[in-house]
UniProtKB/Swiss-Prot annotation:
Family: Belongs to the bacterial ribosomal protein bL9 family.
Gene label: Mrpl9
Name of the protein described by the UniProt record: Large ribosomal subunit protein bL9m
Biological source species: Rattus norvegicus
The UniProt record lists the keyword Mitochondrion: yes
Subunit structure: Component of the mitochondrial ribosome large subunit (39S) which comprises a 16S rRNA and about 50 distinct proteins.
Length: 262
């Protein structure tokens, strides 16, 4: 009986080996996704990252011309770093055009890789900060300083232009003296009310003298390139600081409330 079972078992083993050679052992190990529990399927796409590990036990040195002998303990590893959790590196680019909140042409900027690869580089707004590109833009910068190329607005200048377009200036003037509005007074109010430093020579007022309260305008030229028209309201000055002007206001109020004025 035992002698008859031996040929049958050997034939089954040979048949199984032939089936594995034809179908491949990978089919046995392939996950049956269609039979898995709903919501716990296998992911067919792997996450492209690098995990750095090292052996827990050091492999002893082998003789010259021989391979080191590995034991089970040499297949035990410990985690050193998972690059998936590594901080995202930034990308250094050189802008070819002005970009809001980033910079102007020729600026060397450091942005997120997603911003650089999805926005700046595909649209031609920037190039890689290679040594050749750095040298090219340095030469262009020197030519602009020498006046051989047209000047461009700086990043601070563009921010100033954008801010002034949304502003309205209020200039307070007293009513106890004769006055005429001039660029020096307007420049002081720009700094006092809006926090913007404007040189008097960069301001342009209407040709007709401004001697009364009302609504006017003034043109501000930023770095000699861009001009912005800012609405301007000339109103009564209501915050006296000098004792003389406070005394004069008190006299005016007393005259209004006195019985003789009525």
């Amino acid at each position: 009986m035992a002698a008859s079972m031996a040929p049958r078992c050997s034939s089954l083993l040979w048949a199984g080996a032939a089936w594995l050679r034809q179908r491949g052992i990978g089919e046995l190990l392939q996950p049956r996704i269609e039979r898995s529990t709903p919501g716990r399927d296998f992911s067919l796409s792997h996450y492209q990252s690098t995990v750095i590990v090292e052996r827990w036990w050091k492999v002893p040195l082998a003789g010259e011309g021989r391979k080191p002998r590995l034991h089970r303990r040499h297949r035990v590893y410990k985690l050193v770093e998972d690059t998936k959790h590594r901080p995202k590196d930034h990308l250094e680019l050189i802008l070819t055009q002005s970009v809001d909140e980033i910079g102007v042409r020729g600026d060397l900027v450091s942005v997120k890789k997603s911003v650089g690869r999805n926005k700046l580089l595909p649209q031609g707004l920037a190039v890689y900060a290679s040594p050749e590109n750095r040298k090219l833009f340095e030469e262009e910068k020197l030519l602009r300083q020498e006046g051989k190329l047209e000047k461009i607005q700086t990043k601070a200048g563009e921010a100033t232009v954008k801010f002034l377009r949304s502003c309205r200036l209020e200039v307070g003037m007293k009513n106890n003296v004769k006055w005429e509005l001039n660029p020096e007074i307007v420049a002081r109010h720009f700094f006092k009310n809006l926090g913007v430093v404007v040189a008097p020579h960069a301001l342009r007022l209407p040709e007709d003298p401004i001697t009364r309260w009302g609504e006017y305008w003034c043109d501000v030229t930023v770095n000699g390139l861009d001009t912005v028209r800012v609405p301007m309201s000339v109103v009564l000055f209501r915050k006296p600081k000098t004792k003389r002007y406070k005394h004069w206001l008190a006299q005016q109020a007393a005259k209004i409330t006195s019985p003789e004025a009525v």
